[in-house]
Swiss-Prot record:
Belongs to the purine/pyrimidine phosphoribosyltransferase family. PyrR subfamily. Keywords: Glycosyltransferase, RNA-binding, Transcription, Transcription regulation, Transcription termination, Transferase. The lineage of its organism: Bacteria, Bacillati, Bacillota, Bacilli, Bacillales. The gene is pyrR. It comes from Bacillus cereus (strain ATCC 10987 / NRS 248). This is Bifunctional protein PyrR. Its EC number is 2.4.2.9. The keyword Transcription applies.
């Protein structure tokens, strides 16, 4: 894979997450009935960063959960020997029933990950509302899904790939476009 361009550096990403945090607070008139749920793996770290910023804005904490969608995907990642899905587990510290759940992921592409996440959430409770926050929306939807909060829209071709690097997993913050 050949890197074509860095489309978000660390400063641009910080600004995008700060803007998303303000939008979440504004749209929900605070965060009293809200829960951030990050989709494993990078969505969790983005959700934690949003929670930190929302805490600074509102002066109160917002609950953060982790969602593993492995069993809900239609393109399961399988272990090579016994052909069973790799499951890491979800951890949502609060009952999501009647809560506004803000799903958080790094990249929105076909919509299949988000559909799987909604299926997983519904098995855990009955939220009053599900919203979606993503760092990058690259288009190419296969399902009728759109993000409520977007850090940056990055139109891509189907021959390109978006790579999100985060400090927590990759020792740097940036978003790049690569040729496949």
């Amino acid at each position: 894979m050949q890197e074509k361009a860095v489309v978000l550096d660390d400063q641009m990403x910080r600004r995008a997450l700060t803007r998303i945090s303000h939008e979440i607070v504004e749209r929900n008139k605070g965060v009293d009935n809200c829960v951030l749920v990050g989709i494993k793996t990078r969505g969790i770290f983005i959700a934690q960063r949003l929670a930190e910023r929302i805490g600074q804005i509102e002066g109160k904490e917002i609950e953060v959960g982790e969602l593993d969608i492995t069993l809900y995907r239609d393109d399961l990642t399988l272990q090579s020997k016994n052909k069973e899905p790799l499951v890491k587990g979800s951890d949502i510290p609060v009952d999501i029933t009647k809560k506004k759940v803000i799903l958080v992921d790094d990249v929105l592409y076909t919509g299949r990950t988000v559909r799987a996440a909604m299926d997983a959430l519904m098995d855990l409770g009955r939220p009053s509302q599900i919203q979606l926050a993503v760092l990058v929306d690259r288009g190419h939807r296969e399902l009728p899904i759109r993000a409520d909060y977007v850090g940056k829209n990055i139109p891509t071709s189907s021959e390109e790939r978006i790579e999100v690097d985060l400090q927590e997993t990759d020792q740097q913050d940036r978003v790049s476009i690569y040729d496949k």
